[in-house]
Swiss-Prot record:
Pfam families: EloA-BP1. The keyword Flavoprotein does not apply. It comes from the Eukaryota. This is Putative RNA exonuclease pqe-1. Residues 783-793, 878-905 have a biased composition (Acidic residues). It comes from Caenorhabditis elegans.
Length: 1647
């Protein structure tokens, strides 16, 4: 709705949509004016019609003369809705002298009721134009002087819902302090005008040369207004506020003539003197409010005019006119930059660069951007509109070199130059985007806020008498309200009213505070902190690439940069020179020409403050980390300087790892390095070449590496100290040094006991230990006191505090002991640990007897370390000191065990018994998981002490407890002095307590979980150790009893013979007890673990310190110590695994036991009178499992003839079933063979054969060798067994079950209930029936028309005599069965490969060209052993290659022309005998070039008589006679007398259309004969399988008829068509006798 006061005059008029009343008088809501009217108003500001007030209100030049109202076109409700959706408007601030608000309603509805005349108004406008005051403000001031008659009340002034109440007040307000000015956040309105404001292009200020003698803040910069000549300049001031706010008051300027030859954008600025409005508040209340809002009254300097006050002193709602000020740049989000960055935008004396794009070359770039309504927007002088710099889409072709600058595609180089020339503020993200898209030779890096200030410009400003400020005073921002942002460019082309005295005072106050702040920052930079406290240098990711490209020349289009005033970001005051540094430029003479220099800031690096944790030292890897030289400085502060060489690595991670680890150190060299004390925030201006900059970068990298090496060196020194202290303490406790200890270790370990016991000499003893030379380390630490001083001065705060705490603990006379270190007071098993490595052999270090596993030496590494360094500090590497050789067990040297004295052993055993009651808590120190799992951990029981001793230990200070430890049994002297590990444990405890107060991090939680798992693992190890020790004690007690008995017998009888006899008897008793145990009890005994140390039954080992480590890898087995040599092996031998026979016996026993239980349960259920359904189901299941037959299965009873008078014989138990002989034969159906041999064996038993088992095995093996297929074997073995049974029953008479005995007939029987003929089944022999009686019975087996079509029988459509149609089946649906004459491609029916005929139509022959399986797939095995195998070779399906080979491919595809050669059977004639005939036929085919062809036709009747047997010669060449299936040879085919035509003639003599033909898969026979017939009985469909598939005739014969046909795979005899036809006849008779066998077919037919 809002047009903004400019645009096309005829396209938009608000009066056509909104009423005049009540919002007409608000500026910005009047009718729009075009650009020409705006130009006239700007060029003639002194006219009565061109006042800014009218321009703001949107009225035309003659709006004041119009009196006729404008007709309304919409309702008031519609107008209100439109106003609510419009952008929020804020009226122009009214000057101080005027307090009355504008009354829009009175100005529009009653224009004649004004208090002054038109002539007075014109005069006021002229005076205001001469004095620089807007005419409307002058008119308002004059009206206020006349009176307040027209002041509206609060109810009369219409207010919007979005306007605050403070808009009605016109009292100027003092600005807030600069640091407290809040940033206005733009409100994204839904109105289009608000969206256009947010997307408004950024306005770039134009900087022009400064006139001599004029301060920068007094210059009003000008740019050319739209559609105005080059000589007309208009000032534009920004208006900050909410999105959609109204513009400030405008002021038109006189045109300034341009000099000849001067471009419009280079025109010199003109200073405009503005006189503030002289007026006072309308009433005393307003004046009082104005005074309350300006509490700080600063006196005006003498000689300073109000219009000379810089614009920074204006208040947020001041009434005084405001001069030009620069608004901070806006980012893409629309938020303003921070107020502190506003003062860094200075005017540079550099001519503007030509615009990148746009029609006008003389105007700046942003002047060409279209406005919200299509008009061009022009930025004002000194105004920085929001910059919107974004990247182009990824698929844009200019994405790598250009950016989207305020909706314009601009090269990144031009944007960089524009930002550098105007000193614009950009954020890091925009700067990174620009640098990424700069050319290679322009990718320089500038810091935030522009470039540093050259010293020559500072000197020039000091010589000119100007204040030596690096920047103009920061612009005084008005208080940003929620609705004060400009909505378009025309609103910002108004001049703020002049400053008031209070605002000028506030300006001076702010300038004074800013200068004091700068002086304070300069003082801070002159006294910089030490170098070691400076932060590390942070370089951008692309800095290295920018440095390499910085020395290349700049392109020709970039103008040379002239040193200008730039802000100082580091806080250095502008009136003082920068601090001296090594990078300051050399002073040049005044005659020398200024050359462009590469100005880059240099910030002195500060090493990071990384805390050093002594309790968790960093474990370094000797193979990955290298430190060449470690030197110690003598001057204060003492620092450890580390020199490293950069390894050549391919990645940063490898370099970091390789630089962090120490290697063998060289000789000690003391070196001093000069360090420059430079403040961390000091900016150093360097004008040196690229080589110096590169050297500087390398120095930074070296400094970083030195800092990292310093950290590692400190950790190494602390670790060495701790190890040496522990060695010294250990040497003190163990006075006797082993003989095989090296000389260097002896030198370190020899410390007098008196010195270690005395509190005052403990430090000297440690010092003496530290000063001893070492053989392998090259760094020599002089004394502990001196080194502690060095460490106190290390500039690392956290590590310094922790180190001081550790040192104080070491220097205390009574160190605090860890409350959980009670395990040091007992003797426990030594721990031996080893490290896993992929390259090195594991090195084992023994744990001392009196040292606890909680010590830091045995603690795990920090969880933050790498996996390669997680071994722990307890591993002794190859290059460690010689003083640790006593703890290392080599590969070739034996393990020596320390012996305990008898008192210690007794005391340890007594404490072990009381361990369950008084058991100390376990340590929470995390240990390595692998080490805790593999290394056995000793017990932690305390020594037994009396109550008095415990009471004394509580009263004794912590430091003296270890000095007063005594044994309750023998009151010996105190053992040892406290070691360094106790102090370390105390510090660790204090640190843990502190860490509990703060919330735990993720790493700490994981560490606690890890410690908990380790404690659980340790508990399990202790339990196993206790059990082993209990067994050992039991064994020792038994041995002690035996010894005592021997001693008693020796004392009683001094004869040695009696003693030896008693010993022999005792050994015999033990052996007898062992033999008395049964085998089952021995198997149930729990075997001892193999990895435990074997116990001895012959001797007692007093030291009890055997070492055993389970070897994880066989490659390191030689380095792992073996078991104790003094211990015998385990007593119980491991039982061998049972063999196959034993396993079978065990399974048979279990099976028999289960069958016995099932029989008992079945018998119990049978004896019950009443059984439930569940019990019946259970009985059926048991009967099935036991194979119990409930009823008689046979209908005939067989009676054996027995010799009369034969005595009754006792029945013998059934002999065992023999095993099969050869497992290699029929390996796929072994289970079937085992079942079959049992049947054969039972049959031979019935024959009373003397060697039934052997005969049964041989008989079964012969059948298995003959039939290699499982299915054939199962069928034939059944036939053979049936034949054997018939031979056995040859002498037994069969008696019919329904027959009546002769005695009953003679006796007569009861006549009343005679049931001779009732219910008797009569058996009909269908074979004896005549054909006339048999024909009606066979009609039910005929195939229907749908079945004929489905099974691909040749059919004629609608009685047509043309070509027949043959449907596709599941076997032929993926094959093209009928081909065109020109098609030469074929598919082989055997190998299923595609081949082509020769061009002349013949077949190509080649040796072994076709490899195939001649039999189908058989399914063998049950569900768990289900396999598909070929019946021909018994190989696995889809895996084995073909077992047969042929020289030619064959096919069953036919030409399409063959479909027209089919003939139908003749139509029956009256009284035709052929109509009642039934024949069974079978055909044999051979392969020809034209496909399968008929070679033999055989037909029989139902009485099994041969009717027809014809041999047919095919019309084309025969490729393969297919002898193995057809049974025909090439000689028979070539000598065949008949052809297909003669065969048809012979066939039709017996067959007509009503004759029933029987066959198996008869559709293939009819296709070969080329005959169409519908009365068909197909045995393949009649006896289908349950899976609805066809069953082979051979299988049906064996299964139903128990007859084998078609020979075998191996004999290659082939099929006999006569045999197949007779088999079909037998199957039909079987179906008549057993109608249930064809029920499946009927069900399928009904479906």
């Amino acid at each position: 709705m809002f047009n903004g006061g400019y645009g096309s005059g005829n396209s938009f008029n608000l009066q056509n949509y909104a009423p005049i009343d009540p919002m007409t008088g608000i500026p910005g809501f009047g009718p729009s004016q075009n650009a020409q009217q705006q130009q006239q108003q700007a060029s003639a500001p002194g006219t009565s019609s061109g006042g800014p007030s009218q321009a703001v209100s949107g009225a035309s030049s003659g709006a004041s003369m119009k009196t006729e109202p404008v007709a309304r076109q919409v309702s008031t409700a519609q107008m209100k809705r439109d106003l609510e959706q419009a952008a929020v408007y804020v009226p122009t601030p009214i000057p101080e002298g005027s307090t009355q608000p504008q009354q829009r309603q009175q100005q529009q509805s009653q224009p004649q009721a004004r208090q002054m005349s038109t002539q007075q108004a014109a005069n006021l406008r002229k005076n205001a134009a001469a004095a620089g005051t807007p005419p409307k403000q002058a008119m308002q001031g004059a009206s206020r002087e006349q009176g307040n008659a027209h002041q509206p009340t609060a109810g009369q002034i219409p207010q919007s819902s979005n306007q605050p109440a403070q808009q009605t007040h016109n009292v100027p307000r003092m600005p807030q302090p600069l640091q407290q000015v809040p940033h206005p956040s733009p409100v994204r309105g839904s109105h289009p005008a608000a969206q256009q404001v947010q997307n408004a292009p950024q306005r770039i200020p134009q900087h022009v040369p400064m006139p001599q003698g004029v301060a920068p803040h007094q210059v009003i910069q000008q740019v050319r207004a739209p559609n105005i000549g080059a000589s007309q300049m208009v000032q534009q001031a920004p208006s900050r506020g909410h999105t959609g706010a109204a513009p400030a008051s405008r002021m038109a300027q006189q045109p300034v003539p341009l000099h000849q030859g001067v471009a419009p954008h280079q025109a010199a600025p003109q200073t405009i003197q503005q006189t503030p409005a002289r007026g006072r508040p309308a009433n005393a209340q307003l004046a009082q409010n104005a005074q309350q809002r300006n509490p700080q009254q600063v006196p005006m300097p003498q000689g300073v005019a109000p219009h000379h006050i810089p614009p920074q002193a204006l208040g947020p709602h001041g009434a005084a006119p405001q001069m030009t000020q620069q608004a901070p740049a806006r980012g893409p989000s629309g938020a303003a930059q921070h107020a502190q960055n506003a003062h860094r935008m200075t005017h540079q004396q550099v001519p503007l660069q030509a615009p990148v794009q746009g029609p006008h070359r003389g105007a700046p770039q942003m002047a060409q951007q279209p406005g919200p309504h299509g008009a061009a927007q022009h930025p004002s002088s000194g105004t920085v509109a929001p910059m919107h710099i974004t990247s182009l889409p990824g698929n844009h072709p200019l994405n790598r070199t250009h950016l989207l600058f305020n909706r314009q595609v601009v090269p990144a180089l031009d944007i960089r130059n524009l930002i550098a020339q105007h000193r614009l503020m950009v954020d890091d993200f925009v700067r990174a985007q620009i640098c990424y898209r700069l050319p290679e030779n322009h990718q320089d890096y500038w810091p935030p806020g522009g470039h540093p200030i050259p010293m020559q410009q500072q000197q020039m400003r000091q010589g000119a008498g100007l204040p030596n400020m690096a920047m103009p005073p920061p612009p005084l921002m008005r208080h940003p309200g929620p609705h004060q942002n400009p909505i378009h460019a025309m609103q910002s082309m108004q001049v703020q009213p002049p400053l008031s005295p209070d605002q000028m005072n506030m300006q001076m106050f702010q300038q004074r505070a800013l200068m004091m702040q700068q002086q304070a920052m300069q003082m801070q930079m002159q006294n910089p902190p030490p170098v070691h406290q400076q932060p590390p240098p942070q370089q951008p990711p692309q800095q290295q690439r920018q440095k390499q490209q910085r020395s290349q020349p700049a392109p020709a289009r970039v103008p040379p940069q002239v040193p200008s005033q730039v802000p100082v970001t580091g806080g250095v005051a502008a009136d003082e020179p920068p601090p001296p540094c090594s990078y300051s430029p050399v002073a040049q003479s005044s005659e020398s020409k200024i050359e462009p220099v590469d100005v880059k800031p240099r910030v002195a690096p500060v090493p990071p403050q990384v805390p050093v944790t002594p309790t968790k030292p960093v474990i370094t890897n000797n193979k990955k980390k290298r430190i060449d030289v470690v030197t110690l400085d003598e001057d204060a502060p003492r620092r450890v300087q580390v020199k490293q060489e950069i390894p050549e690595v391919s990645s940063t991670s490898d370099a970091t790892k390789s630089d962090a680890a120490p290697t063998a150190r060289g000789a000690v060299r003391i070196k001093q390095e000069v360090e420059s004390d430079v403040a961390p925030n000091t900016i150093l201006i360097s004008a040196k070449k690229f080589e110096r900059m590169k050297a500087e970068a390398e120095d930074k990298e070296d400094m970083k590496k030195k800092i990292a090496a310093l950290q590692e060196a400190l950790f190494n020194i602390q670790e060495e100290r701790r190890v040496e202290k522990e060695i010294a303490a250990f040497a003190t406790t163990n006075q006797a040094v082993p003989q095989n200890q090296p000389a260097s270790s002896v030198q370190i370990a020899q410390v007098s006991t008196s010195e270690s016991d005395a509190p005052g000499t403990s430090e000297a003893a440690a010092t003496e230990t530290m000063t001893s030379p070492k053989t392998k380390n090259n760094v020599i630490v002089e004394t502990e006191g001196e080194q502690e001083e060095d460490e106190d001065e290390i500039p690392i705060k956290k590590s310094k505090k922790r180190r001081a705490k550790i040192v104080s603990n070491d220097e205390e006379e009574e160190p605090v002991r860890h409350p959980k270190r009670r395990s040091d007071e007992k003797r426990e098993k030594r721990h031996v640990s080893y490290a896993e490595s992929d390259d090195d052999m594991p090195v084992v270090k023994k744990k001392r007897r009196n040292q606890s596993p909680e010590d830091p030496e045995y603690s795990a590494a920090s969880p933050s370390e790498d996996e390669d360094d997680d071994i722990g500090s307890f591993v002794v590497s190859d290059n460690e000191d010689d003083d640790a050789d006593s703890f290392v067990v080599g590969d070739d040297e034996p393990i020596e065990y320390e012996e305990e004295d008898e008192d210690d052993m007794i005391e340890r055993r007594s404490s072990r018994k009381r361990r369950s009651d008084s058991r100390s808590k376990k340590s929470a120190t995390p240990t390595d998981r692998r080490r805790s799992r593999d290394t056995p951990t000793g017990s932690r029981s305390m020594r037994s002490t009396s109550p008095n001793d415990r009471r004394k230990s509580r009263e004794t200070p912590p430091g003296n407890r270890s000095m007063r430890r005594t044994s309750p049994s023998d009151g010996r002297k105190s053992r040892d002095t406290p070691t360094a590990s106790s102090s370390m444990s105390s510090s660790t405890l204090s640190y843990c307590k502190k860490s509990k107060e703060t919330p735990m991090s993720y790493e700490e939680i994981e560490q606690q979980k890890k410690a908990k798992r380790q404690r659980n693992c340790k508990t399990r190890e202790e339990n196993r150790e206790r059990k082993r020790l209990a067994q050992l004690e039991e064994l020792e007690s038994s041995e002690t009893t035996g010894v005592r008995r021997t001693l008693r017998s020796t004392q009683d009888n001094s004869d040695p013979l009696d003693a030896s006899l008693a010993t022999t008897i005792e050994e015999f008793r033990k052996t007898k007890k062992k033999d008395a145990k049964s085998s089952e009890n021995r198997a149930k005994e729990k075997q001892k673990p193999m990895n435990k140390r074997p116990t001895s039954s012959a001797s007692v080992d007093s030291n009890d310190d055997g070492v055993h480590i389970p070897a994880k890898r066989m490659a390191h087995a030689s380095s792992v110590p073996g078991p104790s040599r003094s211990k015998p092996p385990m007593i119980g031998a491991v039982k061998n695994r049972p063999n196959h026979t034993e396993m079978l016996d065990k399974r048979n026993k279990e099976s028999e036991e289960k069958r016995r239980k099932d029989r008992d349960e079945l018998e119990r259920l049978r004896n019950k009178k009443h059984t439930t359904e569940e019990e019946k189901i259970k009985m059926a299941r048991l009967q099935n499992a036991l194979k119990v037959v409930g009823k008689a299965a046979g209908l005939k009873a067989t009676v054996k003839k027995e010799l009369t008078g034969s005595p009754a014989k006792k029945q013998k138990p059934a002999p065992a079933v023999p095993k099969i002989l050869d497992f290699s034969v029929g390996r796929t159906f072994t289970a079937i063979r085992q079942t079959a041999i049992k049947l054969v064996f039972d049959t031979f038993l019935e024959r009373d054969s003397p060697n039934a088992a052997r005969e049964a095995q041989e008989f079964e093996l012969s059948i298995a060798k003959q039939y290699t297929d499982g299915q054939k074997y199962r069928i034939n073995i059944g036939h053979k067994v049936a034949a054997l049974r018939k031979e056995n029953t040859s002498g037994i008479l069969e008696v019919n079950k329904n027959a009546v005995s002769h005695d009953k007939i003679l006796a007569g029987g009861p006549k009343d209930n005679c049931t001779v003929a009732r219910g008797r089944k009569t058996h009909v022999d269908h074979r004896q029936l005549s054909i006339e009686k048999l024909h009606p019975l066979l009609l039910q087996f005929k195939l229907t028309t749908s079945e004929l079509e489905t099974n691909a029988y040749p059919m004629r459509r609608d009685g047509s005599t043309k070509a027949v149609s043959i449907a596709d089946t599941v076997y032929t649906q993926n094959k093209k069965m009928f081909l065109d004459d020109y098609d030469m491609s074929r598919n082989c029916s055997r190998c299923n490969k595609e081949f082509k005929l020769s061009p002349n139509g013949t077949m190509i022959r080649s040796t072994g060209i076709c490899r195939y399986h001649n039999r189908g797939v058989a399914i063998n095995g049950k569900r768990d052993t289900f396999r598909k195998r070929y019946s021909c070779c018994n190989e696995e399906f889809n895996v084995a290659l073909g077992c047969k080979f042929s020289d030619v491919h064959v096919t069953d595809q036919l030409f399409k022309k063959e479909l027209s050669t089919f003939v139908s059977t003749p139509v029956p004639v009256p009284n035709d005998q052929r109509s009642t005939r039934v024949y069974a036929l079978d055909c044999e085919m051979v392969y020809t070039i034209a496909g399968p062809a008929l070679a033999r036709l055989t037909m029989v009747d139902m009485q099994r008589n041969r009717v027809l047997d014809v041999f047919v010669k095919p019309p084309t060449d025969v490729l393969d006679p297919n002898t193995e299936f057809s049974g025909l040879t090439m000689e028979q085919i070539n000598s065949a007398p008949d052809t297909l035509k003669t065969c048809h003639q012979k066939l039709f003599k017996y067959v007509n259309a009503d004759t029933i033909l029987i066959g198996h898969s008869l559709e293939s026979d009819l296709k070969a004969m080329r005959v169409v017939h519908k009365n068909v009985i197909d045995t393949a469909i009649l006896f289908r399988s349950t899976r609805d598939t066809k069953v082979a005739l051979k299988v049906l014969s064996a299964k139903l008829l128990h007859k084998n046909i078609q020979g075998d795979n191996e004999d290659a005899i082939g099929h006999d068509s006569m045999e197949d036809a007779l088999t079909c006849v037998d199957l039909i008779f079987y179906g008549l006798r057993n109608p249930e066998s064809i029920a499946i077919r009927e069900a399928n037919t009904n479906c």
